């Protein structure tokens, strides 16, 4: 059995850990609000961008001049999985849940005879995926030095992806990220961004107004589609940022409460051991006195 001194050291160490997890929880909580507002503000813009492009695409359906970002390459053989994760850990299952979804998609595609490539954004996803798919990772973007995510960072990633698409390196690109729902709920999400999926209107949907476009639809799409890739990636990065702080806040809260419970149990064991030791010493003193 450990000595009383060892027990005191262990209790002090657990209390120090509890202070750290509590501080990290408070920091995550302070950053979460701003990250959540940014993610929620980006959603309507990204959704409206999709709606506008869908409307214009419907007007130019069948045009031979349609952009490949909309029409695709005509093939479905090579898939690029754009996996966005965090740069840091201590956030529960935030990173692993995104990687798990991407890994499941990759294995399913490979079982169908498809070729799979990875474009990793974030250190944690890259470290996990390279254990199994190292030769299939074609690019890795590290954002550890970025203090605040801006559209310029998403635009740079989008340019790299589009350049590889134009070079014929892949046929389909799917974006993986974590959609922020609440502090305790972050939803791993897969979204195809190349070629853009244009959803057909529902049968009972209200009629959509018809517009005349100037310049021509194809010219508008050629300008909007590359930007839309950047917008969707930017949205994913903002959703990830909010999800990370939400997951970290929840994880550190659990860690703080677990540390408190551990301190309670350790203190109980310490007090019992100390009481037993005192009782033993008293018995020895009494026995010695009686012997005299």
Curated annotation (Swiss-Prot):
Keyword Membrane: yes
Keyword Ribosomal protein recorded: no
PROSITE patterns listed in its UniProt record: ATPASE_GAMMA
Gene3D superfamilies: 3.40.1380.10, ATP synthase, gamma subunit, helix hairpin domain
Entry GO CC: plasma membrane; proton-transporting ATP synthase complex
InterPro entries cross-referenced by the UniProt entry: ATP_synth_F1_ATPase_gsu, ATP_synth_F1_gsu, ATP_synth_F1_gsu_CS
Keyword tags: ATP synthesis, Cell inner membrane, Cell membrane, CF(1), Hydrogen ion transport, Ion transport, Membrane, Transport
Family under the similarity heading: Belongs to the ATPase gamma chain family.
Function: Produces ATP from ADP in the presence of a proton gradient across the membrane. The gamma chain is believed to be important in regulating ATPase activity and the flow of protons through the CF(0) complex.
Protein name: ATP synthase gamma chain
């Amino acid at each position: 059995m450990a000595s009383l001194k060892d027990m005191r050291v262990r209790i002090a160490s657990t209390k120090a850990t509890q202070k750290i997890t509590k501080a990290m929880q408070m920091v995550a909580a302070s950053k979460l609000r701003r990250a959540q507002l940014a993610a929620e503000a980006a959603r309507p813009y990204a959704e409206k961008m999709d709606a506008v492009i869908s409307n214009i695409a419907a007007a130019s359906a069948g045009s031979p001049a349609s952009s490949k970002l909309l029409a695709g390459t005509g093939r479905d053989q090579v898939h690029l999985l754009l996996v966005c994760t965090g740069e840091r850990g201590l956030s529960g299952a935030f990173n692993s849940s995104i990687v798990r979804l991407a890994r499941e998609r990759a294995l399913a595609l490979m079982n169908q005879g498809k070729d799979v490539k990875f474009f990793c954004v974030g250190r944690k996803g890259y470290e996990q995926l390279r254990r199994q798919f190292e030769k299939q990772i074609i690019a890795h973007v590290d954002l550890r030095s970025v203090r605040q995510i801006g559209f310029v960072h998403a635009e740079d990633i989008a340019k790299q992806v589009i350049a590889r698409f134009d070079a014929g390196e892949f046929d389909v690109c799917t974006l993986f990220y974590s959609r922020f729902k609440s502090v305790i709920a972050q939803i791993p999400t897969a979204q195809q961004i190349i070629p853009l999926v244009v959803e057909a209107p529902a049968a009972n949907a209200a009629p959509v107004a018809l517009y005349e476009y100037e310049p021509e639809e194809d010219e508008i799409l050629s300008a909007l589609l590359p930007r839309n890739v950047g917008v969707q990636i930017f949205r994913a990065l903002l959703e990830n940022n909010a999800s990370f702080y939400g997951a970290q806040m929840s994880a550190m809260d659990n860690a703080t409460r677990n540390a408190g419970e551990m301190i309670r149990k350790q203190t109980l064991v310490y007090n019992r051991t100390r009481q037993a030791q005192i009782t033993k010493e008293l018995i020895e003193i009494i026995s010695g006195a009686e012997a005299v």
